UniProtKB/Swiss-Prot annotation:
Annotated function: Converts 2C-methyl-D-erythritol 2,4-cyclodiphosphate (ME-2,4cPP) into 1-hydroxy-2-methyl-2-(E)-butenyl 4-diphosphate.
GO molecular function terms attached to this record: 4 iron, 4 sulfur cluster binding; 4-hydroxy-3-methylbut-2-en-1-yl diphosphate synthase activity (ferredoxin); 4-hydroxy-3-methylbut-2-enyl-diphosphate synthase activity (flavodoxin); iron ion binding
Keywords assigned: 4Fe-4S, Iron, Iron-sulfur, Isoprene biosynthesis, Metal-binding, Oxidoreductase
Transmembrane segments: none
Keyword Nucleotide-binding among UniProt keywords: no
Cofactor note (record): Binds 1 [4Fe-4S] cluster.
Cofactor(s), by name: [4Fe-4S] cluster
Record organism: Klebsiella pneumoniae (strain 342)
Catalytic activity: (2E)-4-hydroxy-3-methylbut-2-enyl diphosphate + oxidized [flavodoxin] + H2O + 2 H(+) = 2-C-methyl-D-erythritol 2,4-cyclic diphosphate + reduced [flavodoxin]
Alphabetized InterPro entries for the sequence: Dihydropteroate_synth-like_sf, IspG_bac, IspG_bac-typ, NO2/SO3_Rdtase_4Fe4S_sf
EC class name: oxidoreductase
Name of the protein: 4-hydroxy-3-methylbut-2-en-1-yl diphosphate synthase (flavodoxin)
Family of this protein: Belongs to the IspG family.
Pathway: Isoprenoid biosynthesis; isopentenyl diphosphate biosynthesis via DXP pathway; isopentenyl diphosphate from 1-deoxy-D-xylulose 5-phosphate: step 5/6
Amino acid sequence: MHNQAPIQRRKSKRIYVGNVPIGDGAPIAVQSMTNTRTTDVAATVSQIKALERVGADIVRVSVPTMDAAEAFKLIKQQVNVPLVADIHFDYRIALKVAEYGVDCLRINPGNIGNEERIRTVVDCARDKNIPIRIGVNAGSLEKDLQEKYGEPTPQALLESAMRHVDHLDRLNFDQFKVSVKASDVFLAVESYRLLAKQIDQPLHLGITEAGGARSGAVKSAIGLGLLLSEGIGDTLRVSLAADPVEEIKVGFDILKSLRIRARGINFIACPTCSRQEFDVIGTVNALEQRLEDIITPMDVSIIGCVVNGPGEALVSTLGVTGGNKKSGLYEDGVRKDRLDNDDMIDQLEARIRAKASMLDEARRIDVQQLEAK
């Protein structure tokens, strides 16, 4: 029931990664990267399908060898989500996966080779209508820039990016997006700010090597949140030393928190105190797990007492306010029923699923009516 975020998106060109639009006001795409051995086709396909189930728009796959390129061919045949091939050092691998239907090529200008090799990759991408991501990383800047700046700086990352943007411009190729990633939040944020002023290509956001599940999520939320709140960013990846599925979940949580893109349930829950009338923490944890399959955007407030419960319920799709033995259930801000505290989880799950089905049906009818006009 909350309004959309009052954020003015940066204007950018439109490209497509497979069937996913990027830039020019398109929904911000959430992506992750496999961490399996790409040559283990079964494991990689299984992980990609798990990422698809939690809403991944795009998945990146590392292709370090020609054997991995051959495996990529088999992987591509078994999944539906667009795949980005991550290429380092050997430009010939990019040419090979292009033959196998890759949806996007990610190259690192710091290690892909000389201009002639880049030209060869670009010509191939143009012929096959494959977009490119220029991926600049603070950890792999070109040697001359390392010597010039002494250490990674926003200006160094910008210069690296612009060097290769200019190269693609000279080759008359505009189907690309750019990233300037760093593990330091301030370095990454300032680099993206500078880059956003220089080009109108889509920007892929990320805090690289952010850390483990908890610390990495925090760093990514701060860094990406700052940029997104300024309207910067067209795709994102939350980089975690964790199950890639968590990257997608955190990515959507960041977008939901900024009211930029909604997917699934946005739970609003109190941290609890001695006033709670039912087990709020247990209820929220259980429902988050049980309702992962719900993709309908909904705000669900679960508050343990009457101090803040009614107020949160007023602006929630569904809201629970703790009471003695029974708790008040609100729907669209109106009190509808009372739920037994001892059976809260099962009752609330049923109500949420019913509401999601109702909202889905209403949206389906709206779409049909629009199409009929």
